[in-house]
């Protein structure tokens, strides 16, 4: 594989093990990336197994050509939030044995300065997962009011200096528009000092802008609900998150569907009726990468894997 598509998949063994793969099963890799998880899933599938991958990054679709000769594999160009629609179009709703979701930005996306995700490499201020559509980060910064910008930084980046950063960006953009990642990163580094060791002051702002312009959290909500619709009984859901906002959504989703409906005290509803509303059960505890994996791949250090199983309908 070319270096362009090289990528170390995070929690690879643990994530695929969580799927409890059947050789003749049907599986969804909702975040294909550069194919690391898909390759591992295919190793566990027999001749009659099937893997459907999804990704909205055009470069990921190109990377999927590595599996062009494998009849078990197919890929859809689109967002993982629409996975239920894609599966339903294939007539596979309720027949899927496992769904894998990895919410991290792939290393090739971060390392390619032209994609505009990295504050360490100068490139166009883009940040779109699908760079064929939607507004760029530069366009968003140019158009957004100070209060709205501060809200995004605080909500999606958990940035404590959100208002100060937004005001400084607005003051500077009135003189010269922000078109490059280095221009934005350098401004934030000048006005803010990160109190977190080995963390660039622009980390949270870049995260916030990326999440916002790609509607990432909305996509996560849609993908989780979609997985619930397409999974067969005893089907597995393996989800990797990379920051607290993502993990909080996944944790609450699994908890909500594991507990069933909340019933006010005194209502004549039986335990059996409540059990019918329990759609998932958590499988094991949240898993974090080993010390060895973090040493080999520093980008894995914040990852968390959660696994759940679809209960009977």
From Swiss-Prot:
Stated EC number for the protein is: 2.1.1.199
GO CC field: cytoplasm
Which GO MF term does the entry hold, naming one?
rRNA (cytosine-N4-)-methyltransferase activity
Question: Which amino acids does the record list as binding S-adenosyl-L-methionine?
Answer: 35-37, 55, 80, 102, 109
One of the protein's GO biological processes: rRNA base methylation
Q: Which UniProt keywords apply?
A: Cytoplasm, Methyltransferase, rRNA processing, S-adenosyl-L-methionine, Transferase
Please give the chief subcellular localization of this protein: cytoplasm
Recorded catalytic activity of this chain's protein: cytidine(1402) in 16S rRNA + S-adenosyl-L-methionine = N(4)-methylcytidine(1402) in 16S rRNA + S-adenosyl-L-homocysteine + H(+)
The subcellular location is:
Cytoplasm
Which InterPro entries does the entry link to?
A: RsmH (IPR002903), SAM-dep_MeTrfase_MraW_recog (IPR023397), SAM-dependent_MTases_sf (IPR029063)
Q: Which family does it belong to?
A: Belongs to the methyltransferase superfamily. RsmH family.
Q: Which purpose does this protein serve, as stated in its record?
A: Specifically methylates the N4 position of cytidine in position 1402 (C1402) of 16S rRNA.
- Protein name (Swiss-Prot/TrEMBL): Ribosomal RNA small subunit methyltransferase H
Gene that specifies this protein: rsmH
């Amino acid at each position: 594989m070319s270096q362009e598509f090289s990528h170390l998949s995070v929690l690879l063994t643990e994530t695929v093990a969580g799927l409890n793969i059947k050789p003749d099963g049907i599986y969804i890799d909702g975040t294909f990336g550069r194919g690391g998880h898909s390759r591992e899933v295919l190793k566990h599938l027999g001749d009659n197994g099937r893997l459907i991958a999804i990704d909205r990054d055009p470069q990921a679709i190109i990377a999927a050509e590595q599996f062009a000769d494998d009849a078990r594999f197919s890929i859809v160009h689109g967002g993982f939030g629409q996975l239920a629609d894609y599966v339903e179009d294939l007539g596979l709703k309720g027949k899927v044995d496992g769904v894998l979701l990895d919410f991290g930005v792939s290393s090739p996306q971060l390392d390619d300065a032209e994609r505009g995700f990295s504050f360490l490499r100068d490139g166009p201020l883009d940040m779109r997962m699908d760079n064929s559509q939607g507004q760029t980060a530069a366009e968003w910064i140019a158009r957004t009011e100070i209060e709205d910008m501060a809200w995004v930084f605080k909500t999606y980046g958990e940035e404590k200096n959100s208002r100060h950063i937004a005001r400084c960006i607005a003051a500077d953009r009135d003189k010269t528009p922000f078109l490059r990642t280095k221009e934005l990163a350098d401004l934030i580094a000048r006005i803010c000092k990160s109190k977190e060791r080995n963390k660039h002051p622009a980390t949270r702002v870049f995260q916030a802008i990326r999440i916002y312009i790609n509607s990432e959290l909305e996509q996560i909500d849609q993908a989780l609900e979609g997985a619930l619709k397409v999974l067969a009984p005893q089907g597995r859901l393996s989800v990797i998150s990379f920051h607290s906002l993502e993990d909080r959504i996944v944790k609450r989703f699994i908890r909500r569907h594991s507990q069933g409906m909340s019933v006010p005290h005194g209502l004549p509803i039986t335990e059996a009726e409540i059990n019918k509303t329990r759609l998932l059960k958590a499988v094991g505890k949240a898993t974090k990468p080993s010390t060895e994996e973090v040493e080999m791949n520093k980008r894995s250090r914040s990852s968390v894997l959660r696994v759940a199983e679809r209960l009977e309908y």
